């Protein structure tokens, strides 16, 4: 969206309120962490336009309560999240009804551009600058990042640990360096996977340092996580695992492949899967996808 905002209003001053200031690029004029102090500041400003693409109550309450000539996205009305106008209704309804969500053929980028009144034309992410970190990595090895977590909200998306081990071994045998990625939640698992597979694991880091680590990879294997967005923004090849979401929501900009289990499952948007369907995504398919993308 930043590219479009700067194109349409090149002289506009952009403010961004966020829970993750570290991922906001310097093109933004004022980056505000989500704190009471920042919210007080926002209440003292009259904006030309405010965009809220988040359906959480606190974000909707802010859009409803702040002063602006034009508002787009989602607001809080009598305690309920509602679309501000017709442009936000599609995204609102697909979030309520699974049948509509499954029928959706728009990527998330298309959806948010339309909510804001624009047409998506393949605009790339804009990433923050994260130089200054040094990594002890082999100079001549092609690095494949293996992001083994899936966040705490939807453990149904986790690929079996034994599959990560086998994939790492196959990548090593093919001459690549598998680098295990993850946060604090994956630390113990990644230590174990590194020991079992011979993959490299450097630890877990701050968000800015994690961005730098992902940038060292040529390809990233991941579920739908922060690492996916970082890999897209850093223009890496991606093998994306998906089992509970609509695959059409994800635009990998022609640099990746979406892989789903070879199993018809009804765990759509479910935090748990009674079939553990990710076990039906074979190591052979994932490895073949990696090799195919790395050959391009």
Annotated model-derived regions:
Residues 1-296:
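Catalytic machinery of carbohydrate-active enzymes
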């Amino acid at each position: 969206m930043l590219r479009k905002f700067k194109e349409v209003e090149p002289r506009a001053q952009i403010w961004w309120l966020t829970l993750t200031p570290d991922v906001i690029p310097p093109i933004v004029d004022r980056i505000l962490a989500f704190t009471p102090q920042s919210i007080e500041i926002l209440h003292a400003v009259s904006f030309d336009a405010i965009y809220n693409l988040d359906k959480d109550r606190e974000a909707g309450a802010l859009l409803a309560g702040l002063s602006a000539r034009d508002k787009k996205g989602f607001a809080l009305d009598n305690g309920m999240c509602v679309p501000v106008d017709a442009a936000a209704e599609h995204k609102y309804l697909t979030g309520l009804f699974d049948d509509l969500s499954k029928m959706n053929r728009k990527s998330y980028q298309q959806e948010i551009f339309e909510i804001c009144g624009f047409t998506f034309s393949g605009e790339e992410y804009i990433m923050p600058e994260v130089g200054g970190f040094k990594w002890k990595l082999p100079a001549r090895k092609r690095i494949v990042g293996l992001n083994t977590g899936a966040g705490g909200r939807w453990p149904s998306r986790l690929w079996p640990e034994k599959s990560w081990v086998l994939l790492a071994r196959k990548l090593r045998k093919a001459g690549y360096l598998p680098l295990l990625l993850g946060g604090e939640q994956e630390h113990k698992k990644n230590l174990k996977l590194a020991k079992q597979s011979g993959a490299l694991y450097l630890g877990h880091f701050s968000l800015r340092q994690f961005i730098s680590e992902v940038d060292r990879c040529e390809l990233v294997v991941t579920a739908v996580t922060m690492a996916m967005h970082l890999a897209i923004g850093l223009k890496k090849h991606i093998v994306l695992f998906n089992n509970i979401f609509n695959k059409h929501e994800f635009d990998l900009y022609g640099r990746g492949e979406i892989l789903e289990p070879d199993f018809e499952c009804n765990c759509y948007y479910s935090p748990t899967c009674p079939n553990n369907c990710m076990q039906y995504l074979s190591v052979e398919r994932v490895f073949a996808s990696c090799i195919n993308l790395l050959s391009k």
